UniProtKB/Swiss-Prot annotation:
Single GO cellular component term: ribosome
Full protein name: Large ribosomal subunit protein bL31
Record's function text: Binds the 23S rRNA.
Molecular-function annotations in GO: rRNA binding; structural constituent of ribosome
NCBIfam families, sorted: L31, PRK00528.1
Domain of life per record: Bacteria
rRNA-binding listed as a keyword: yes
Gene3D superfamilies: Ribosomal protein L31 (4.10.830.30)
């Protein structure tokens, strides 16, 4: 196996949408960083059986609809 080709694993804190926290090892960020989740398994419609609503991060869905909305069937 080649040496020094794998990313560094370190401990981060993950904060769920309800405020609960847990510590895990990850390649994301730096040691001690905090990852705040916008959606997690406790609130995601695929896992809760709730309504299928879309979260428009940065207006991406709106931008897509404006660009391709007139191509309706």
């Amino acid at each position: 196996m080649k040496a020094n080709i794998h990313p560094d694993y370190h401990k981060i804190t993950v904060v769920m949408t309800d405020g609960s926290q847990y510590t895990t090892r990850s390649t994301w960020g730096k040691e001690g960083d905090v990852l705040n989740l916008d959606i997690d398994p406790r609130t995601h419609p695929a896992w809760t059986g709730g309504s299928q609503t879309l979260v428009d991060h940065g207006g991406r869905i709106s931008k897509f609809k404006n660009r391709f909305g007139n191509l309706g069937m």
